[in-house]
């Protein structure tokens, strides 16, 4: 019987950034090995924040792309500028992907970050659907926000986001990171090293 994977990523081809390319490569590998994969993403718009020609920012659309069921959901699309606008983009995708994900059959859920709120959606889906979920960590968020001075580490918002992040790490059945440094950092934060896997 085929394993059914539900994958959440706000970047996916035809976008050509690193998250989209990495996600596509992983999914194609799984499909070739017999998995049935459904991706929930949004209308392609990176990096200009403008929907690509031939696509619309609709509430819901479903297509078959290279053997993968691709569901695109509505999100607040904006150029990659301004903290508040980006957060609106992230949160809107998290909400719509969660709602649509509730109606998708699966055996396992994978959610990739950045951005951080995709992982929130994946975790909540896992709780509601009683399925295991894997968190792929490509950036230590909200640490990355602090690194570019977009938010102070002693602010209430940062402390709250950091608490959510640690909660997500504990809830995930497995965590995939892209560097040895990321694994070391998570272990330092108290995450069980046995459930952290490095895939470069």
Short names for language-model regions:
Residues 1-66, 196:
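N-terminal subdomain of nucleotide-sugar transferases
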Residues 5, 108, 126-145:
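Active-site proximal beta-strand in glycosyltransferases
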Residues 10, 113-114, 137-140, 200:
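Histidine-centered beta-alpha loop that forms part of the nucleotide-sugar donor binding/catalytic region
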Residues 39-101:
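A conserved catalytic-core segment of Leloir-type glycosyltransferases
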Residues 41, 132, 154-200:
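Donor nucleotide-sugar binding/catalytic pocket of nucleotide-sugar-dependent glycosyltransferases
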Residues 69-72, 97-118, 131-136:
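Short N-terminal targeting/anchoring amphipathic segment
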Residues 98-99, 105, 117-120, 124-128, ...:
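Membrane-proximal helix-turn-helix segments that form the acceptor-binding/catalytic region
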């Amino acid at each position: 019987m085929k394993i059914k994977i539900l994958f959440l990523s706000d970047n996916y081809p035809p976008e050509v950034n690193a998250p989209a390319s990495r996600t596509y490569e992983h999914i194609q590998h799984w499909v070739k090995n017999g998995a049935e994969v459904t991706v929930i993403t949004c209308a392609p718009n990176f990096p200009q924040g403008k929907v690509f020609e031939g696509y619309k920012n609709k509430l819901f659309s479903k297509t078959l792309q290279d053997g993968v069921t691709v569901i695109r959901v509505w999100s607040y699309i904006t150029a990659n500028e301004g903290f508040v606008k980006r957060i609106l983009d992230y949160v809107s995708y998290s909400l719509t992907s969660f709602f649509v994900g509730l109606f998708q059959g699966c055996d396992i859920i994978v959610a990739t970050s950045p951005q951080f709120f995709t992982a929130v959606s994946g975790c909540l889906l896992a709780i509601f659907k009683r399925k295991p979920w894997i968190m792929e960590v490509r950036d230590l968020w909200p640490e990355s926000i602090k690194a570019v001075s977009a938010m102070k580490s002693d602010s209430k918002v940062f402390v709250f986001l950091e608490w959510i992040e640690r909660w997500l790490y504990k809830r995930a059945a497995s965590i995939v990171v892209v560097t040895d440094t990321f694994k070391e950092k998570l272990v330092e934060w108290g995450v069980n090293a046995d459930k952290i896997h490095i895939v470069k």
